[in-house]
């Protein structure tokens, strides 16, 4: 198998674009930056300095929990010297990336966004990190997140600059950045870093990608290793990348998996299902932009098939919370012990800072209850057993039947039904959480891959909208190739400007 660095520049990629230098180096995509360093047009130090400066200029976003500038610059200098000495270039050689703070990276604390783990410095990297480091990537910092990954707002009361709580949106600093990979989303969207890793249980890579105007990819569960990642639900969890282009996502995926990318398909060969239920009850800006995107694809020859899954939300609800709430306790307990964190499960829970996350643990996970039904407490263990035995297989079979019956490559829908909401305690409500995950959660519960792409900016609010495609488990290569085609029609995501957003930040 050929290593990505040995391949010729991507078919269809404009060489002039790859080697063109923008006014600011932090405007480069991951692919562009790696090409410029590889061909000695710029140095790794220049790149790292540019993005470190950008990170410092946008501290009000609360995008990072930790940054190690000295170590990053030392690695950059080392790589520059390596190339000067005639070393063979690496696929990501000398290019900075960021990593969500629940994915272990040696040299950084792995807090999972919670105070009890603030002093936990792992002795080994998460397995998904290893191929990226071997490819020459430089981890400059760990990104902020919804505490313990249990939410979609990024309103983390433990890690923030003075006076500004919550990870903030790249396009409007008064709004949320999505979650739980909040910092990874806003860091890429605000051009603080060209790419970042996050984790996705029910939309936690795709939502931050969508609301920050970038691309977020959730692979099939099991495609990327999860060793060394603070868990929620082993059945549903997966790491995934966020970047500014599908090209960058494909590059990262090929490095992590060692697989060569699939050819970009012809429009006429693509069949996308529009599930009615996932297009209902949308906010007007989301509806307009995503319907416009669908029309553009259809005009190019993509086959759009209208389909229905009348019980999609009911089936998903029967799986989603039972799995996350029940699996969390045992998975976290095992993780804390196996990775020698020095913190017990009880100590972890006692230190939770964010009120919404504390409520989840104290009212549901610790007592082993799912809630109430007709005045009676619902036993969590029984709900989990039912979900695994009946509800999840039914959901998976329903997707398989839909794809087979209509000969679909993927389904397509708005990533989130609404624009990013204001960043405040109300953003942590269960109602806000349920609304944010509504469209991305069902396929997550079936272990399916999905990728969110930018569909444009809302006209009045100036906020990004995402459109997502999801395929059956194992269809990642085909899904990424379709995403490449879609991006060629819709264009890449917008770039935020600082003018007009500084005054919006809620202190």
UniProtKB/Swiss-Prot annotation:
Resulting phenotype, residue 31 to I: More active on the (S)-enantiomers of mandelamide and lactamide than the (R)-enantiomers
Leading EC class: hydrolase
Outcome of mutating residue 100 to A: Abolishes activity on mandelamide
Mutagenesis or variant effect for residue 437 to N: More active on the (S)-enantiomers of mandelamide and lactamide than the (R)-enantiomers. More active on the (S)-enantiomers of mandelamide and lactamide than the (R)-enantiomers
Pfam families with a match to the protein in the record: Amidase (PF01425)
Highest taxon in the source lineage: Bacteria
Listed SUPFAM superfamilies: Amidase signature (AS) enzymes (SSF75304)
pH dependence as annotated: Optimum pH is 7.8.
Active site: 100, 180, 204
Keyword Plastid: no
Record-level Gene Ontology MF annotations: mandelamide amidase activity
Activity regulation details: Inhibited by 3,4-dichloroisocoumarin and PMSF.
Record InterPro entries: Amidase, Amidase_CS, Amidase_dom, AS_sf
Assigned EC number: 3.5.1.86
Keywords, alphabetical: Hydrolase
Phenotype for residue 202 to A: Increase in KM values for aromatic substrates, but not aliphatic substrates. Active against lactamide but not against mandelamide
Induction: By growth on R,S-mandelamide, and to a lesser extent mandelate.
Catalysed reactions, semicolon-separated: (R)-mandelamide + H2O = (R)-mandelate + NH4(+)
Family per record: Belongs to the amidase family.
Assembly and oligomerization: Monomer.
Record-linked PANTHER family: GLUTAMYL-TRNA(GLN) AMIDOTRANSFERASE SUBUNIT A (PTHR11895:SF151), TRANSAMIDASE (PTHR11895)
NCBIfam families (alphabetical): PRK07488.1 (NF005688)
Function: Hydrolyzes both the R- and the S-enantiomers of mandelamide, and phenylacetamide. Has lower activity on 3-phenylpropionaide and lactamide. Does not hydrolyze benzamide. Hydrolyzes esters and amides with little steric bulk. Preferentially hydrolyzes aromatic substrates.
Name of the protein: Mandelamide hydrolase
Gene source species: Pseudomonas putida (Arthrobacter siderocapsulatus)
UniProt gene name: mdlY
């Amino acid at each position: 198998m050929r290593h990505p660095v040995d391949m010729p520049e991507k078919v269809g990629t404009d060489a002039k674009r790859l080697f063109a230098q923008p006014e600011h180096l932090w405007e480069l995509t991951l692919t562009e930056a790696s090409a410029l360093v590889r061909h000695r047009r710029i140095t790794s130090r220049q790149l790292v300095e540019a993005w470190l400066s950008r990170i410092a200029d946008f501290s009000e976003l609360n995008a990072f929990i930790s940054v190690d500038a000295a170590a990053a610059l030392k690695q950059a200098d080392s790589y520059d010297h390596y190339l000067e000495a005639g070393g063979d270039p690496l696929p990501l050689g000398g290019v900075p990336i960021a990593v969500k703070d629940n994915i272990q990276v040696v040299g950084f604390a792995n807090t999972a966004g919670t105070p009890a783990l603030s002093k936990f410095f792992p002795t080994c990297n998460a397995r998904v990190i290893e191929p990226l480091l071997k490819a020459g990537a430089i981890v400059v910092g760990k990104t902020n997140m919804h505490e313990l990954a249990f939410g979609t707002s990024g309103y983390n009361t433990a890690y923030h600059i003075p006076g500004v709580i919550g990870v903030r949106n790249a396009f409007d600093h008064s709004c949320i950045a999505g979650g739980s990979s909040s910092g990874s989303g806003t860091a890429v969207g605000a051009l603080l870093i060209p790419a970042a890793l996050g984790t996705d249980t029910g939309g936690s890579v795709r939502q931050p990608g969508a609301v920050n105007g970038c691309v977020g990819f959730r692979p099939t569960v099991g495609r990327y290793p999860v060793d060394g990642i603070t868990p929620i639900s082993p059945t549903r969890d997966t790491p995934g990348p966020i970047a500014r282009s599908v090209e960058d996502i494909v590059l990262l995926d090929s490095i992590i998996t060692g697989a060569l990318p699939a050819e970009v398909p012809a429009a006429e060969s693509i069949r996308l299902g529009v599930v009615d239920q996932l297009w209902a009850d949308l906010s007007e800006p989301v509806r307009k932009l995503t319907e416009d995107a669908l029309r553009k694809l259809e005009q190019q020859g993509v086959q759009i098939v209208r389909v229905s899954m009348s019980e999609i939300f009911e089936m998903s609800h029967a799986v989603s919370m039972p799995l996350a709430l029940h699996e969390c306790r045992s998975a976290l307990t095992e993780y804390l012990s196996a990775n020698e964190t020095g913190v017990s499960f009880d100590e972890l829970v006692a230190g939770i800072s964010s009120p919404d996350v504390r409520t989840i643990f104290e009212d549901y996970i610790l007592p082993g209850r799912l809630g109430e039904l007709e005045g009676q407490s619902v036993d969590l263990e029984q709900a989990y057993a039912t979900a695994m035995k009946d509800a999840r297989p039914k959901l998976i079979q329903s997707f398989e039947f839909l794809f087979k019956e209509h000969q679909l490559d993927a389904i397509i829908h708005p990533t989130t039904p609404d624009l990013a909401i204001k960043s405040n305690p109300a953003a942590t409500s269960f109602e806000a959480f349920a609304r944010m995950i509504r469209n991305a959660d069902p396929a997550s519960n079936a272990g399916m891959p999905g990728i969110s792409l930018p569909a444009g900016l809302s006209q009045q609010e100036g906020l990004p909208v995402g459109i997502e495609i999801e395929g059956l488990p194992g269809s990642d290569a085909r899904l990424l190739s379709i995403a490449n085609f879609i991006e060629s029609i819709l264009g890449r995501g917008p770039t935020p400007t600082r003018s007009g957003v500084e005054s919006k930040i809620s202190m």
